[in-house]
Amino acid sequence: MSARICITGASGYLGRALCRKLDRSRVLALVRAGSAARVEPGVASLELDVFDAGQLTRALAPGDTVVHLIGTPHPNPSKAAEFRRVDLASLQACASAAGRARVAHFVYVSVAQPAPVMQAYVEARQAGEAAIAEAGLAATILRPWYVLGPGHRWPYLLLPLYAIAELWPGTRDTARRLGMVTLEQMSRALARAIGDPPPAGTRRVLDVPGIRAA
């Protein structure tokens, strides 16, 4: 039997998009109480406290792939406290559990960095990456800046500005690092990362150009 793919945040818009690209018979959605009904059809779910490392450890098994997608919806600078209370705390619990369970691969959606804005968000995601490293996990870290999708379309208006910025040597690297990706690109990159894990004990990072090329 193929190893499981255990996904936190599977009921969110990115989690659902990812599940549609996977063999659903292999997926276990780890969701908060009351969220199982929002998981994609055909995906098994387990309701638990996603902030409780003990519960998460008992849900995982050696050889599993864990994909951590929990995050504050529509992040903005006013949500700094939520970034630590939700994004970081859930990641720390999940990484700790994954280490104890000896999972094979940990996949985390971080954020493009460095960045001139959203410092609290970037710091929370950097701390999440550090927790993964501390747990000694083989990991794939994806670093998008903004994912265009349902309810997240207004930044399409900025695409012409990004195109201009990528033409100039002085702004090219920043524009590419902080470029936007589509929901299709993001879910495809996640699915490919799951299917092609890095060697044991190593960490692989996909920035925006890498996500687009996946």
Language-model segments: what does each one mean?
Residues 20-22, 41-44, 60-61, 81-84, ...:
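Short, glycine/charged-enriched secondary-structure capping and boundary segments
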Residues 35-93, 97-100:
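NAD(P)H-binding glycine-rich loop region in Rossmannoid oxidoreductase-like domains
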Residues 6, 46, 107:
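Conserved Rossmann-like nucleotide-binding pocket used by diverse enzymes
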Residues 10-13, 101, 116-214:
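Oxidoreductase cofactor-interface core, primarily capturing Rossmann-like NAD(P)-dependent enzymes
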